[in-house]
Amino acid sequence: MRDYLKEKTFVRFPGGECYEILGMIGEGGSGLIYSAGKVVRQGENYVKENSLRFALKECYPISRQFNFLRMQSGEIVPENESEAAANYLRCVASMQLNEGQMTSEIYDSEAIRLIPIQRIASSVEISFDKGQHFHYVNNAFTVMASMENKGESIASWYQKNGRYTMEMIFRVIQETLFAVREVHLAGYLHLDLQEGNIFVTGQPTDESLTCFLLDFGSARKRLADGLCAPVGDQPIFSSEGYRAPEIVGIMTGETPDFRLGPEADLYSIGYLLLYLLTGRRYSTRMLEDVRKSYDTSGGGRG
């Protein structure tokens, strides 16, 4: 389990722009996502600039190959010193910093159901005493546009009240499909869709419901044929259960040159529907066992 930054931690970007952590609101395979408010210096102290909330993403990956931890200073480092682990962390940070360009291209395509990135930094200053003392950490951070009117993650929304009708759940899935379609039409695959990085706002009982996507750390550009280039040795992040079989094949090395397409995102949405309908989480192995059982019983025959 990753150790997240606690509430009231200050994160200061190069140039002096400073944010106060208000709590963790989501997580993906490549990092943690916090709710934050902007603070400004007033005399010897920092004060809240306004009531707007932003999303801060911190590079803190989960990997099958390497383990990472947070030092007392707040910096994310490999658990065991190795050049390979350090290179992996640098690669993930670089991918996160490239999110700005990707989300900008998607947003410029008239996509409205995503939260674009406003600021990026390969290192920041952190304060654990409300801005009295800061120190540098080599943690990559990005600031996403204001979270005002963007609601809450599906994870939070779903846990608040278990009394959801089929119609409400299917409306959320429909809105998620609309959001993912915008990404696909803009020429990208998301590849890390899960309940923690899909935000829902409005009422699930009427037309006001809208879903927004964030965390494009795993996103890949689609080529002319609609597929992305082979991932190769680059990290690819996806969450357990939501991970399409073809992504599993890439991660295990069974099909390293497989080219991913839109169906990988659709698989993740299918798993989201399963989770919302049952309230249960299924591992990749559990889903594979169900599939094999279905095939063995003859359920797949027409």
Say what each PLM segment does.
Residues M1-G16, E20-G23:
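Juxta-kinase regulatory segment immediately upstream of eukaryotic protein kinase catalytic domains
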Residues H184-G202:
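Catalytic-loop of the protein kinase fold
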Residues G196-G241:
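Activation segment/activation loop of eukaryotic-type protein kinase catalytic domains
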